[in-house]
Every structure is written in C-alpha cells, then in structure tokens.
C-alpha cells in the first residue's frame, strides 16, 4: 500500500492555518519512487460527500478513482497510471447531491483557455540559471538604487498576426530588449495566475499556483525570468488574492459551500 503524501501532522497544521508549504503536498505530485510511479492527488473539500479524480488516465471516468478523506476535510489518492502531462479535474459530490467538475486549486499548470482542466506538471526538473544575479551585492541595496519599473500585461503587449499571445520565447526576444533600451530596471508583470477571461487582465484567477498557460509552461516562464536576470532586469509579479472568478470550474462554491470565499 502506498502511504499518503500528507502526514497527520501536516494535515493538522493545514487545519490550523499554519501549513505554509501546503503547495508541496496539495495538488498533483509525481511519485519520486521509481518502483511506484504515478501521481499523488490531494485536495481540500471539507463539506463534500465524495471526491474522485477524473482525467486522461481513466478516460474521464469519475467513478474510477475515488479519494480517501483524511482529518480536516482533506481528500487524497495515489493513481499509478497517471503521469506528467495528463489533464484532470476533481469530481465533487456535494451534500445537496450536485456533482461539480472542478480544477485543482493547487495545480501547477492548466489547459489553455477555453479548456479548463488542470495538468500534471513536474516543477523539480528545471535548474535556475540566475545564481550570479541573486548573489550580486546590489541586490542587498535595492532601496538605495534607482528603480524604474515597466508594468506590462503580457496578453496585450503584442500579439501574433493570428491574434494569439506571444510565447515566453518571443517575449525574451522582444520585450527584454525593449525594456533595456528604454532604461527600465524591472518588469512588473500583471497577474500570471491562471484565469479564463483575457479581459480580466489576470485579476479573476482560478488558482494561485498555476501560472497561465497562455504564454507557455512553468519551465518556459522560469527560462524567461532567467533571461531577464541575465541582463540585470528584475521581475515583479502582480499578485492579488483578494478575489477570483466564479466560473463553474473555479474556486467558487468549491465543495458546494463557500470555503474559499469565507
């Protein structure tokens, strides 16, 4: 039997509001044990009657993989056949008898809109290349240095001829040189959290751990940040947790009750 990814102590900390690294256990995490390959799924839905995982690995059969409920309303399961790149959602049965198809609040990656599923992603493969930037003495004296911030919405800054957004690779080639030429020291990126509606500028999120897939995957985002740091451009992310969208797959009424609105 595969042990749960989250311990009783961590579950207790989460219930008390003190598990500050909850993202390391909640959501979808690939097993590090080569003898037991698969994915751990963990979600908080304290008022749900039942929760299962539906996705590419079970042909979206919501009856195939029911989760176990732990203390504090935490649901978890290990699915051996799940792998990196698989799309998935949680199927939540509420006390009213409704069935909700929800994205993962702790997902690291999601489908490109208008699709709404979460995607299993491994964040541990990328190696940061900005050690020199992080160790630079000026990093400790930023309050005493001139600062000129370029705020940008990556969705609307430039588009391809077909109307699609620029990728991180394209932004590396065009946005970074522009910022340097104009004398900016930092790029402030308007919210990168996943969101369904371009017009919200990213302020109506569906989750706070999933960087939007509009421009590429999380590793491509980190490569973009590395490229900024390589030329001494700092990166600031606009992050607003005060509100989120109420789309059916999002955080609103997540388990049939307002657990994220409260």
Where are these regions (language model features)?
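The feature marks proteins involved in alpha-glucan
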Residues: 1-36, 40, 69-151, 156-163, ...
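Glycine-rich, histidine-containing beta strand-loop boundary motifs that form or position
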Residues: 43, 55, 79, 92, ...
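Short proline/glycine-enriched turn/loop motifs at strand-loop junctions of beta-rich domains
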Residues: 44-51
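Solvent-exposed serine/threonine-rich low-complexity stretches and specific carbohydrate-binding patches
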Residues: 62-70
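Substrate-binding/active-site clefts of carbohydrate-active enzymes
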Residues: 131-146, 153-262
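Short beta-strand elements bearing conserved aromatic residues within extracellular beta-rich modules
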Residues: 51-53, 88
């Amino acid at each position: 039997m595969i042990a749960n990814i989250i311990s009783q102590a961590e579950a207790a900390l989460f219930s008390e509001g003190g598990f500050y690294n909850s993202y390391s256990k909640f959501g979808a995490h690939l097993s590090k044990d080569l003898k037991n390959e698969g994915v751990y799924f963990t979600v908080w839905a304290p008022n749900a009657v039942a929760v299962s995982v539906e996705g590419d690995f079970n042909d979206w059969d919501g009856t195939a993989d029911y989760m176990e409920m732990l203390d504090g309303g935490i649901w978890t399961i290990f699915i051996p056949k799940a792998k990196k790149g698989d799309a998935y959602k949680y199927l939540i049965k509420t006390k009213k008898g409704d069935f909700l198809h929800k994205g993962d609040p702790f997902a690291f990656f999601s489908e490109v809109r208008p699709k709404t599923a979460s995607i299993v992603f491994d964040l541990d493969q990328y190696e940061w290349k900005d050690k020199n930037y992080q160790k630079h003495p000026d990093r400790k004296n930023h309050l005493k240095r001139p600062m000129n911030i370029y705020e940008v919405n990556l969705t609307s800054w430039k588009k391809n001829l077909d109307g699609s957004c620029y990728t991180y690779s394209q932004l590396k080639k065009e946005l970074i040189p522009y910022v340097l030429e104009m004398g900016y020291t930092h790029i402030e990126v308007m919210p990168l959290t996943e969101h369904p509606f371009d017009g919200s500028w990213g302020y109506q999120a569906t989750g706070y751990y999933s960087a939007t897939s509009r421009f590429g995957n999380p590793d491509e985002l980190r490569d973009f940040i590395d490229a900024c740091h390589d030329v001494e451009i700092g990166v600031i992310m606009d992050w607003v947790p005060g509100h989120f969208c109420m789309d059916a797959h999002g955080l609103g009424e997540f388990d049939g009750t307002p657990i994220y609105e409260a």
